[in-house]
């Protein structure tokens, strides 16, 4: 029996994994095994939030070497990460400085100037991408204005997954799904938009033509001397997660739940109407020419920060405590831009409740309950915005990613949205990464074919809405909470 062994490098903003997939084509069985896990976190360098890119590369190589040490012949490798951040290279291909995190404050005020100078409708008409203050469009302008002495030495800019592929193969690539997150790709041409790039103040020569998922970038030479193909997968982690979302029909929506929550639906055409602009809907690139019509929600970033600040290590116990608390005593707008990177998340949440004359959550369970209720209510609002945009309601919501393990949040989401929620798979980004590799190896025909493999190998859990739940009755009041300055508005 012939087996295919593919390795997925899946990097998130808080952790990274090297995962080994084993696929049996005849039985269509697909298994995953974690080979190596490591921490990823922001580090301050000269007062700037940066990524320790060299440490991450070392961890990736450690994971790949571990697979080889087991005597496994790897058929291919794929890398997916978060979007918008980039690495600068000189003409010799050497790294210049450390990549700055999208959570750094250097872009403060830049988006507002772009809108004033270029026009919001023009930017959106060109890119189809939502307005987020950390988009690469604004990061590059901040770079050009704040570090002009640096850019004269730059020859190339690679997005994070493309940089790691370059380090493994020596070949540069600009993968399309991740490139679209920059707000610099023209939605009609699938190439870099000349006007938007000109506004950044950096050279268009830094960027090569974007390539769609499924091409071989080059080869990594393993310690045994074998040349292993490195595939350009859908390198934006959400794009990979959507590929692995077992969407039952065209009327199914998805929610990729992790540090960020990305809620949306698939479409063969983009949505760039005035209504889409008003709702700040994004049209990010997907596999096979599909668009990921979605909206960013701050997600479990709030919980991750609270857990760290409150020294909570047992999440299951915390959720059990949280479940005993009354719903909607404390409600915030998770997308308020005050929560993007506060000095202390717990204190910021408490301040937001205090300022709106609510009870103040003090215990870890109360803070978690505030986050879960608030996210569920925001999910319901965004799902309604998306349904209005497409002109018809959704039949199901598929929650994938690490956040889908939170049964309480899944049920609250079903109750608030009034829709059936199907949770799983957990390892959606990794699976979507593997799916593109298997298509590149000619083991699968397309995304829909791969989704049948996912449903045949991974258990899904269904959550039915309870229409009488208090959270469903609170939605009208929540609308008032959203009258704040939203990050993603």
From Swiss-Prot:
Keyword Acyltransferase carried by entry: no
Highest taxon above the source species: Bacteria
One of the record's GO molecular function terms: ATP binding
Any Gene Ontology CC annotation: cytosol
Listed InterPro entries: ATPase_NBD, FGGY_C, FGGY_N, Rhamnulokinase
Role according to the record: Involved in the catabolism of L-rhamnose (6-deoxy-L-mannose). Catalyzes the transfer of the gamma-phosphate group from ATP to the 1-hydroxyl group of L-rhamnulose to yield L-rhamnulose 1-phosphate.
Similarity annotation: Belongs to the rhamnulokinase family.
Listed name of the protein: Rhamnulokinase
């Amino acid at each position: 029996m012939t087996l295919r062994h593919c390795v997925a490098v899946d990097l998130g903003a808080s952790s990274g994994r090297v995962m080994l997939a084993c696929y049996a084509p005849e039985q269509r069985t697909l298994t995953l095994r974690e080979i190596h896990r490591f921490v990823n976190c922001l580090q301050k360098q000269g007062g700037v939030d940066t990524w320790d890119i060299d440490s991450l590369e070392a961890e990736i190589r450690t994971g790949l070497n571990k697979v080889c040490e087991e005597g496994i012949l790897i058929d291919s490798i794929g890398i997916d990460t978060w979007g918008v951040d980039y690495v600068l290279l000189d003409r010799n291909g050497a790294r210049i400085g450390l990549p700055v995190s999208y959570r750094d404050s250097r872009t403060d005020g830049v988006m507002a100037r772009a809108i004033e100078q270029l026009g919001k409708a023009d930017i959106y008409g060109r890119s189809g991408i939502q307005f987020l203050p950390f988009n690469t469009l604004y990061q590059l302008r901040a770079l050009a204005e704040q570090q002009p002495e640096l850019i004269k030495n730059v020859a190339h800019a690679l997005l994070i997954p493309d940089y790691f592929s370059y380090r493994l193969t020596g070949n540069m690539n600009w993968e399309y799904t991740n490139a679209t997150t920059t707000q610099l790709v023209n939605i009609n041409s699938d190439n870099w938009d000349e006007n938007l790039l000109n506004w950044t103040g950096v050279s268009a020569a830094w960027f090569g033509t974007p390539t769609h998922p499924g091409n071989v970038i080059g080869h990594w030479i393993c310690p045994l001397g074998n040349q292993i193909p490195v595939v350009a997968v859908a390198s934006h982690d959400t794009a990979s997660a959507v590929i692995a979302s077992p969407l039952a029909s065209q009327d199914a929506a998805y929610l990729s739940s992790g540090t960020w929550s990305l809620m949306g639906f698939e479409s063969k055409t983009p949505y760039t109407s005035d209504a889409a602009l008003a709702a700040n809907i994004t049209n990010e690139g997907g596999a096979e020419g599909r668009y990921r019509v979605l909206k960013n929600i701050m997600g479990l970033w709030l919980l991750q920060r609270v857990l760290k600040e409150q020294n909570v290590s047992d999440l299951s116990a915390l959720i059990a405590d949280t479940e005993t608390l009354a719903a909607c005593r404390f409600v915030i707008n998770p997308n308020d831009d005050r929560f993007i990177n506060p000095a202390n998340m717990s204190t910021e949440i408490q301040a937001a409740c205090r300022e709106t004359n609510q009870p103040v959550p003090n215990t870890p369970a109360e803070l978690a309950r505030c986050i879960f209720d608030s996210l569920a209510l925001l999910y319901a609002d965004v799902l309604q915005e998306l349904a209005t945009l497409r002109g018809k309601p959704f039949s199901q919501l598929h929650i994938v990613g690490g956040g889908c393990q939170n049964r309480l949040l899944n049920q609250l989401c079903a109750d608030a949205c009034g829709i059936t929620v199907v949770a799983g798979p957990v390892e959606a980004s990794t699976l979507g990464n593997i799916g593109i590799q298997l298509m590149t190896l000619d083991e699968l025909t397309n995304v829909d074919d791969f989704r049948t493999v996912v449903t045949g190998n991974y258990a899904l859990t269904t959550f039915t809405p309870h229409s009488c739940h208090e959270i469903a009755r609170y939605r009208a009041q929540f609308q008032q909470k959203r009258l704040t300055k939203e990050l993603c508005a």
